[in-house]
Amino acid sequence: MITPPEPAHRFSHQAMGTFFEIAVADEDETYAGQAAQAVFREIDRIESLFSRFNPASEISRISRLKPGESLIIGIETFECLTAAEQVRQETHGAFDINVRALTKYLAPDNPHPPRNLVKGSESSENPRLPTNLLSLNKGSELASSPLKLVRTGSRFEALLTAQKDAAQGTLDLDLGGIGKGFALDKALALLADWSIENALIHAGTSTAVAIGSAPKAMGTKNSETHCTISEQIEVSPNSSLNSWGWPVGVGGGWPCPDAPRSVLLSGRALSGSGTEVKGHHILDPRTGNPAKGHIAAWASHSSAAIADALSTAFMVMDTQEVEAYCSRHSDLWALVVKDYGNCRVYGKVR
């Protein structure tokens, strides 16, 4: 028999350009607070590794590598870059952590025009960088990739290979589309180390991940937390939902009659992206042109990092591409909004 958890204790912390909030269902508020502070310290540590605004971060140092140089990196950077490359490959370049380099190349005042455009795309309307930015130490099949990740036992290394055709400034890595989700995954794992069995964590309400279930008190006035920004998720107490999990709103204000207005998260994550939050300047990394896929997208996956990256990719991909992707990944479901009143749900919502 499942015993409903005790009322949730809430804690918030600013990091990664947003506010992280933890709702912990634990009978001891002091213990829950200690666990939350441990999580926030871990998120701060991950930010120190990932932030492109910090010149000492591992991501900034990788972006400054010159051909032939390498950098010893931590397992977190290795894992996040590996996850980013996985999504890039699976979405055929719709998600790319090096898109900032492309943006700089397309700038009209760029004194160094691209010298490594993809063959067949040299027109000024459709320039782009090589899509095989990253090699995961798979040998000669990806030998042309400028950045290689190498793991030797417990040693992790990023290497920028020397390429005679590599353009200046090829690397300008930005983990903004996956880093917060990655931090949420690590946060949830740390809560498990503290034997916390019922918790929800969200990053600015754009990505959330949960374990266990919300307490009954989620339906009381004092415990309410709402967010109504369209492309963000809504952390919403809903006392009519009696199943196991944490009630989280989805779909924003878009009229989606065939889509759920809320889901129960437990053991998985939900992430949302959209033009109202990120603006109309989202580029399609495959073309360098403004994205024309969707105006809002949500993705739910067991990994918050993957959900975070996919919600960004689904903004770029067209509806048929999203449908095909979801059909190949049974652990995923997605909601995309093409235009007002035109919504599609793919995969089994859970």
Say what each PLM segment does.
Residues 1-350:
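Mature catalytic core of soluble alpha/beta enzymes
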